Design a protein with these regions (language model features):
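Active-site-proximal alpha-helical scaffold in enzymes
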Residues: 11
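Active-site core of glycosidic bond-cleaving carbohydrate-active enzymes
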Residues: 14-220
Length: 220
């Protein structure tokens, strides 16, 4: 089938979480013919986004479920698609969906986002995922990806929104999540969330030793 999935014997449409992970792999494991499947995945979403700007977990689908972490992950991959392919036409069509989706989040008094559970969390397999920290990092990563896309495509109308939220999260992140044992929204430390804090840029080089101790102690 010409779609991204992890269970081809029962899945008929692409799941955004699977698509995000697999698209990133296709850029260096397959030839340029694979770009067409990624393009199809991006453009299919244009016809399935809901009237309240929710991007569904899979499309086409009779059940328009939302999993925010997976959708935010997918938004970051749209930027990768632009960088690898130069297909500005496809990304320009999808860009408004990105902005409208990012506007679904409210900002708290602490400068960080107000957590949205979506239809279900489904952040990762197993137990112990720090869903709130992961969503914060994925949201920030999606913001910076959208800002880079806007810059590359010379779209200026959303700069204030994107830069404002980026700066807000940067100013409030450490106070909310940084603790003696690592980054956490509670009392336990998730290696995935700490690693993502580094990948998205919210954890700087001065935090690498702190994150390293989490990676050495936890294994999810």
């Amino acid at each position: 089938r010409d779609g991204y999935m992890d269970c081809p014997e029962r899945e008929r449409s692409p799941y955004l979480g699977d698509a995000a992970n697999q698209i990133s792999e296709t850029f260096y494991s397959l030839d340029e013919n694979s770009y067409e499947m990624t393009k199809k995945t991006i453009l299919t979403l244009l016809g399935w986004v809901t009237t309240d700007n929710i991007i569904p977990l899979r499309s086409p689908s009779q059940t328009l479920n939302e999993c925010p972490a997976q959708t935010l992950n997918f938004l970051t991959v749209v930027r990768e698609y632009l960088l690898y392919t130069g297909d500005s036409q496809t990304v320009r069509k999808f860009y408004p969906l990105m902005i409208n989706y990012l506007k679904l989040w409210e900002m708290g008094d602490d400068g960080c986002i107000v957590y949205r559970p979506g239809t279900f969390m489904w952040t990762d397999w197993g137990e112990g995922a720090d869903d709130k920290l992961l969503q914060e990092c994925w949201y920030y990563y999606a913001l910076t990806s959208a800002l880079d896309i806007a810059d590359r495509l010379s779209i200026a109308g959303d700069t204030q929104f994107l830069e404002g939220r980026i700066q807000s999260i940067e100013s409030g992140f450490d106070a909310k999540y940084k603790k003696a044992g690592g980054f956490s929204s509670g009392t336990s430390y998730d290696d995935r969330a700490n690693a993502l804090a580094v990948v998205c840029g919210l954890a700087g080089e001065e935090d690498y030793a702190l994150v390293s101790q989490v990676l050495k102690m936890q294994e999810k």
